[in-house]
Curated annotation (Swiss-Prot):
Source taxon at top rank: Bacteria
Signal peptide start-end: none
Source species taxonomy: Bacteria, Pseudomonadati, Pseudomonadota, Betaproteobacteria, Neisseriales
InterPro entries reported for this sequence: CutC-like, CutC-like_dom_sf
Origin species: Chromobacterium violaceum (strain ATCC 12472 / DSM 30191 / JCM 1249 / CCUG 213 / NBRC 12614 / NCIMB 9131 / NCTC 9757 / MK)
Pfam families named among the record's database cross-references: CutC
TM annotation in the entry: none
GO cellular component term of the entry, any: cytoplasm
Protein's UniProt keywords contain Cytoplasm: yes
Subcellular location: Cytoplasm
GO molecular function per UniProt: copper ion binding
Main location: cytoplasm
Entry protein name: PF03932 family protein CutC
UniProtKB keywords: Cytoplasm
Length: 247
């Protein structure tokens, strides 16, 4: 069976680079420094118009934990409807209860709103209290895919749990490793986990084209370089694709 490479892209340019590099699917996010938040309507609409590969979008109203207020949940529901109206192929979301369990009721509501779109439960799973039960809850909520590092700092470190989760799922859901996936470890991860879909960022730093640069004034958190950003590299995606094809 062909192996699938999904790239987490933080901009339209990154989406295009992912496609050029040979990815079969893109997850479009904003604010990757916070783990990804919901992208803008404009970014979603333009990505849908420019991509020939599958396009998913993260539905996450803010950084931080995955326990959402009623207002935040309502915003997530509206964002799911926007993605459906734009013709996206899927949405990526994750909700937990205060006790660290999957919020089955709310996840099921969003999955129902998604309609024909695929629903991936993201790495909120990696903060869940009990992974085997969390997997059953994700399946019961109507998700078709789980993105996980195996509750470890990286997917290669969590490969043993990922393999167990894949076996437990038994084809009811696709387990997709993500976090720390690189050309040098993706083949080993495929062998250790038995998974066939993989999630990576393949990012590199891009310097700002600004010639005039005012020092001492920041627009965000202290220590953040205002004149550099991370973008998906088509060459890194291509290296991942080639390594995965040989796995």
């Amino acid at each position: 069976m062909d192996k699938i490479l999904e790239i987490c892209a933080g901009s339209l340019a990154s989406c295009i680079a992912a496609q050029e590099g040979g990815a079969q699917r893109v997850e479009l996010c904003d604010n990757l420094g916070e783990g990804g938040t919901t992208p803008s309507y404009g970014a979603l609409a333009m990505a849908r118009g420019r991509l020939n590969i599958a396009l998913h979008a993260i539905i996450r109203p803010r950084g931080g934990d995955f326990l959402y207020s009623a207002l935040e949940f309502d915003a997530m529901a509206h964002d799911v409807e926007v993605c459906r109206s734009l013709g996206l192929d899927g949405v990526v979301l994750g909700l937990l209860t205060a006790d660290g369990d999957v919020d089955v009721a709310r996840t099921r509501q969003l999955a129902a709103l998604a309609g024909p779109m695929a629903v991936t439960f993201h790495r909120a799973f990696d903060l869940a209290r009990e992974p085997e039960q969390a997997l059953e809850d994700v399946i019961a909520a109507g998700c078709s895919r789980l993105l996980s590092s195996g509750q470890a700092a990286s997917a290669p470190e969590g490969a043993a749990l990922l393999a167990r989760l894949r076996e437990q799922a038994g084809g009811r859901l696709t387990v997709m490793p993500g976090a720390g996936v690189r050309p040098g470890n993706i083949a080993g991860l495929a062998a250790a986990s038995g998974c066939i879909e993989f999630h990576a960022s393949a990012r590199g730093q891009v310097a700002s084209a600004m010639r005039y640069r005012r020092g001492g004034v920041g627009m965000g958190a202290s220590g953040v370089d205002e004149y550099a950003r991370q973008e998906t590299s088509a060459s890194q995606v291509r290296a991942l694709r080639e390594a995965l094809d040989k796995a």
